[in-house]
Amino acid sequence: RTFISPVERNSVFAEGSYTLSDSAKVYGEALYNKRESAQKSWRQLFPNIAAANPSNPFGEIARSIVTIPTNQEQEVEFKRAVVGITGEWSSGFLDGWSYDAYIQRAESDATYVNDIIYNDRVNATTGASACNSAAITISGPVTCQGVNWFSPSTITTGNFSDAEKAFLFTRDIGKTSYTQNLLGASLSGNLFDLPAGSIGAVVGIEARKDSINDLPGFNARNGNLWGQTSAGQTKGDDTVKEAYTELEVPLLRDIPGIKRLTFNGSFRWTDYESYGSDSTYKVSLNWQFIDALRLRGAYGTSFRAPALFELYLANQTGFIGQGSVDPCIQ
């Protein structure tokens, strides 16, 4: 027994490069990661049993409170590959500038398994009859099985008969996949010299497409989980295009009170297929008095478009907050 849920991780990483010439080198990276995790816990099952139910010995509505084990398992595989070319221009107006162009593919595939209680089958076995097959509207057709909700072994130890377990409990399996395709390129170098140093610049572009497909298990998608939230399939994609630039300008250096004073400015334009376009910027000033003392100030803007999960989230079920139904805390 352990208080910490077990997690097993395995990773493989490889990278390499090949020099084509003094000004060009191709490179590549590959990453594979697999994670397996599991959680073992306990939960309660506490349905209201109708007074006329054959398992109810009290002659009026009563609640059976049962503690049962419940487990979850997850397996996640992540794969990423990058291929690019980098180097330095050796002639023309970009002489001395560095370049980098690359493509990337990333995939994440997950399987998650949850122990669940059939909601429709609980409803079928807690009414006026031992088992009402008409109430099994989602997980059927199945042979109706009555449940002895007030059996001493069930109440005290959570042990149902094998037939009752097979009827009430199952494992719901969901799958989630994310993919990303990315293309990017950048140039960096010095524009010209100032008395305090060279003005450095970077320009770049990037385009990427992200997609998600989260498919919960059948019972989760159909709201057939007793005592648990559920959700439908979340599926969709988005394409993003970006262009950016950044300047580093040395203003002053090596004068009394100023070892180095530098201005930095950056600008980024972003266009989401789902959201539209917007731009952000940042300006900063870096004042180094001496080696051990520096003062920085910055101002910038930002924005965030909806993530895929937020953009394509399907309908969900949940629970009413306790504060809205419990008069003792209202």
Task: Go through the PLM ranges and name each one.
Residues 187, 246-250, 264-269, 279:
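Active-site-adjacent structural elements in folded domains
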Residues 278-284, 296, 309-311:
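Short beta-alpha junctions and helix-cap segments that line functional grooves
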Residues 237, 270-279:
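Solvent-exposed loop/turn segments connecting transmembrane beta-strands
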Residues 123, 243-245, 249, 279-287:
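Feature captures outer-membrane beta-barrel proteins of Gram-negative bacteria and organelles
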Residues 270-272, 288, 302-308:
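Short, conserved secondary-structure transition motifs
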Residues 1-8, 13, 17-241, 254-256, ...:
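Surface-exposed, low-complexity loop segments enriched in small/polar and acidic residues
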